[in-house]
């Protein structure tokens, strides 16, 4: 089943000039100005003899091909009446004759409509030109686009009257992590926007938009973290048909299809598949995963061309090729021009481009109705330095031959079926005759419609030798897959081939390359009379044979990453099919779509919501398109406090919600009926455009009522058996690989993981996904591992973060990312700050260099805090389990030879209580232990060579580092000796080899600092590679129990001052709570609810516990739709927060602008003069790689930017979140420092959001929270005292 993730709807407000436009105009509701342009409307039902025009919704630029058009009839009538003006009798006679002649001609046209093979039409605009949606057809437009960093841009082209006034079009931008707010761009487009396209060249994402006239615009934010958009450049390109960005790296082949492994044949009920060529299907279907390469494999084996320039390709209807690029020397945007050779008065109707593996080269496939039913493939080479564009004809594909072959095969198949029916049903001759007549009638209709096809869309299938073509008829459509293959030539055909080509093929290899149709599927509507007569019987007997009038295809979309083809039907349903066979995988019908999967919580009453809406900022004086209306008594206002709609049970909402929804729908339907009764066959919500997520796991659909809905792949339909779980975990791991290589955000993959893990049998899929991803990552060369290690660690942390009960694994992953970040920062800063200090002319040291050193010292404080935290946890572990044997980790036998660093080892812990010792898993990763050793040695050197007296530096000297290194070195030696000895004994190695390995480790640990202090960085010994596998786990635990004999007890002497919870806050290891997936976690079945509560209290995550319990209550069976809940969080923060880059403490309620990571929600202050070592983190977060989002200050956090608006009024619930996060501090600090914050926060809440009654509830809730936190702290101190 295709699951729905979230939906947002933007209602357009009424501007002031709307009321001045006259009484003839109606309310510009989004539902009132859309009409279908997919050639699926019955011509006879929309034929008006009075105007002699066919009011179909086809392209108005296609003129009729009949002998006598309406213009000729009118001219003939006018000429006859003008020639006989002097004679009244003759006038009457001539007029009567003319009327009779015109009526006869009209009757003749009506008869020709039933037999003519090809008919194109034009539209009569006289009846509804005031309400028409001035847009473009679905297949030629892209009104929504999804960027690689999770931004969705969409637009709707509404004009009140296109003949009187052209309006300024708007583009809306929202982030999927924050669906409650969006950005509005007032564009310079006055005509309908035809396409939106995000650049795939990270990190500077650009938005491309072009309209139907003569304008292509590039949009960019003012900086990398703000929401202020501006037009970067405008290109005067006329009659644009297509514009695409070239990828920064050439496209990878799609990963394997997990749905085709089950060999399910779920055909659509409203379609018929006439492709019965089983041989072709069996040859082309991917029945095994071995035929596809994983992204990591293609990275190693394939040659990929990296584009060094930001480049986009634009093609116009008249064949012009514009190649736009950014000139680095000129620092401006430029373009070069090429031309596709076309005959005079010929235009291009459909086109698609595909970049090849060669540099500066691409393929273009075009279709023109003037040329005929054929596709022409061109090869284009360009050189931006010489401004040369070379166009070469490559292939010509005739679609007429394919259709004729299709009809012949269909006739032969039906003849065989009729013969079989006659043999089997000889006793029922009357029924056979009726069936034969119906089949012949349907066959005749199919033949007529097949001949009236025209190509509507072309898609490259990630290959230069495969195409997907959409063809449309009067009331039918078809999709074809074309592949260029080697075809053997029979001996009678050799002479013909030699005659036509001039050369004969090789005798040994009598094969030629030719485009062939490997898969096809036909969608058509039977005759209305037959369908009406047999509707009852078809519905009762077999719904699969019932073809309604809206079963044809409106548009197609191909997801290149996952390799799935999405079909949008004209009846509103969405279908996903296999790209190789066109077999249906899943279908989401219009009646099955949820009304609203998620409604953003609005914790306001009607009056306050109206006030906050009126005070919300707008851009360029435009009306803010918000969910609630700006009018006081508008039926669009939402009055309930909090709403979450279950798609499987729409009646589960409150009465206010249902009544409000009914009022909205009633008003929309009234406006729609008033405005669309002239040209719409029915008032239905149509899908205008779709786009896929960066990794192809989700799609975003834009509907005609300006509603964006996210749908996922039907991953739950794969199954829950162990074999199916292996397939899903491997498939998700390869999607994560694709996101790493293409620098895409992996939010959509986490959504798929969440949806699949709703069943109790599949809640361990996350663990197997991490194992697959880690195993494949370890097979990469070391150079690639160093390049993608940062992203790999962030992905593992993101997976652990959304799983209930895996908070310790998340903390370990975050700490690992911190360690790598600090080690890389100190290494890169070592040479410029210590080895080459800059001096002024008077010989003194530059003050800027000293300041840089002091800022580096602040980073070292984190390393010292972590070292103390690490030793303390090691001592606690040995203290608790020294005399106990209940700690045991039973790893499966199949994973005993797998390195433990690929997964969280204590996932297999079988203790009765919960395992709540973070950082202990580091002892199983020797590579990470050596990195910690290097980090502390470099920190010691910085401390010794930099003298500072800053008050904000906690550790003035390096004695804490010496203390840590003394005992940390002993721990490494003991663990290495045990692992090396056990590995060597199992492999029957000589004792000399064991001693040599241990000698190298001892030399490395004893001489590393000496080489470092002597500035011999190139001579530092590299530690040997030691792998700790699953078979070593029990022996490592036995050594960990004896750490109390290695580590002195004085490491816990200051327990009362520095507790574990305070260390979480200082080290920034708390799991964030305000993300979309944080509110929709995966419930782990390995831990009980009581254990989860204990663990979350230990980590300071009590607020997440409520979400987990709610998720358990709503998601225990794993059946039905997945419910996603979301409540917007405030952007303010309280308490002590450290800058994620500089580690400088940030005071609460600062007035400086700051940035917040959209993925891990950590904060950094925007410095006017950034330090040289922090410049590289201006684009993304150093911990998780997420993008920054800027905020002006905490006092103005209601609106994060002048361009950002809340779709639902944002509930300032930060006081609620920070109550739970503040339990990281002791109760005295908490009570003494947060009273003022609460008072100030309540004051702001009274000012912006809440009334007096809500404040009373808030105060009561705060008192309860304080008591609860005090009890937790007293209980925790009691445990620490007993342990001491």
Curated annotation (Swiss-Prot):
Residues 76-104, 651-662, 669-678 have a biased composition (Low complexity). This is Putative mediator of RNA polymerase II transcription subunit 16. Pfam families: Med16_bridge. InterPro entries: MED16_bridge, Mediator_Med16, Quinoprotein_ADH-like_sf, WD40/YVTN_repeat-like_dom_sf. It is found in: Nucleus. It comes from the Eukaryota. Belongs to the Mediator complex subunit 16 family. Its main location: nucleus. Residues 614-636 have a biased composition (Polar residues). Keywords: Activator, Coiled coil, Nucleus, Repeat, Transcription, Transcription regulation, WD repeat. Component of the Mediator complex. It comes from Dictyostelium discoideum (Social amoeba). One of its GO terms (cellular component) is mediator complex. Component of the Mediator complex, a coactivator involved in the regulated transcription of nearly all RNA polymerase II-dependent genes. Mediator functions as a bridge to convey information from gene-specific regulatory proteins to the basal RNA polymerase II transcription machinery. Mediator is recruited to promoters by direct interactions with regulatory proteins and serves as a scaffold for the assembly of a functional preinitiation complex with RNA polymerase II and the general transcription factors.
